[in-house]
From Swiss-Prot:
Pathway where it operates: Cofactor biosynthesis; ubiquinone biosynthesis
Keywords: Methyltransferase, S-adenosyl-L-methionine, Transferase, Ubiquinone biosynthesis
HAMAP family in UniProt: UbiG (MF_00472)
Organism expressing this protein natively: Paraburkholderia xenovorans (strain LB400)
Protein name: Ubiquinone biosynthesis O-methyltransferase
One example GO MF annotation: polyprenyldihydroxybenzoate methyltransferase activity
Positions of S-adenosyl-L-methionine binding: R36, G55, D76, M120
Length: 232
């Protein structure tokens, strides 16, 4: 059984044609991307590395990592999003190998294949996030890096990420997030530890409504990223 929520998939498929519009529904992803890209690259040194981007959507992160010289494969379960990703790759001239396949299925086919695995803004949209973490560990080479980003689960994150972002500032379409699926850093670290992934770094991402920019922070109370390594 696929570890995917049909309702979640449909939400993103319906918006797929707007994925690369920096002023539309995916504007926050465009604004987040330089921060997450530089953070990933600072740890993993992407040039020349084989990289898997799980839940790649329309390919914003996938293309940016490929632009740094990585050999990138992006996977997703949205046919529409992958169609947009393929088309944009052709238009931009940035080569990314896209495939419609579940992370668990690819893990069974290609264990220990990738230097770097990324799973960004995806875990909070699946029924069984721990299974995705386990697939990431299987897919990465010994000594490789795995990067996650998701949303903390507390009153502040509900107010900021759901009420604030979706209903007040209208940065995101209403219903983008299900608060019950938010994941505390301790829970994500526990998922990783259970698969023998070692946590190497954790950083928060903070949005300033005045400057309208995201910045890295020690504050992990809303958005955060976790870097893990599979020991050699």
């Amino acid at each position: 059984m696929t570890n995917a929520d049909p309702h979640e998939l449909q939400k993103f498929s319906d918006l797929a044609h707007r994925w690369w519009d920096p002023n539309a529904e995916f504007k926050p992803l465009h604004e987040l991307n330089p921060i997450r890209l530089s953070w990933i690259d600072a740890h993993a040194h992407l040039t020349g590395k084989t990289v898997l981007d799980i839940g790649c959507g329309g390919g914003i992160l996938s293309e940016s990592m490929a632009s740094l010289g990585a050999h990138v494969k992006g996977i997703d379960l949205s046919t529409q999003a992958l169609g947009v990703a393929d088309l944009h790759s052709l238009e931009s001239g940035v080569t990314v190998d896209y495939e419609e396949i579940a992370a668990e299925a690819l893990a069974a086919r290609e264990p220990g294949t990738y230097d770097v695995v990324t799973c960004m803004e995806m875990l909070e949209h699946v029924p069984q996030p721990a299974a995705i973490v386990e697939a990431c560990r299987t897919l990465v080479k010994p000594g490789g890096w795995v990067f996650f980003s998701t949303l903390n689960r507390n009153v502040k994150s509900y107010l900021f990420a759901v009420i604030g972002a979706e209903y007040i500032a209208q940065m995101l379409p209403k219903g983008t997030h299900d608060y019950a699926r938010f994941i505390r850093p301790s829970e994500l670290a526990s998922f990783a530890r259970a698969t023998n992934l070692r946590t190497a770094d954790i950083k928060g991402i903070v949005y300033n409504p005045l400057s309208k920019h995201f910045t890295l922070s020690a504050d992990t109370s809303v958005n955060y990223m976790l870097a893990c390594r599979r020991d050699a």
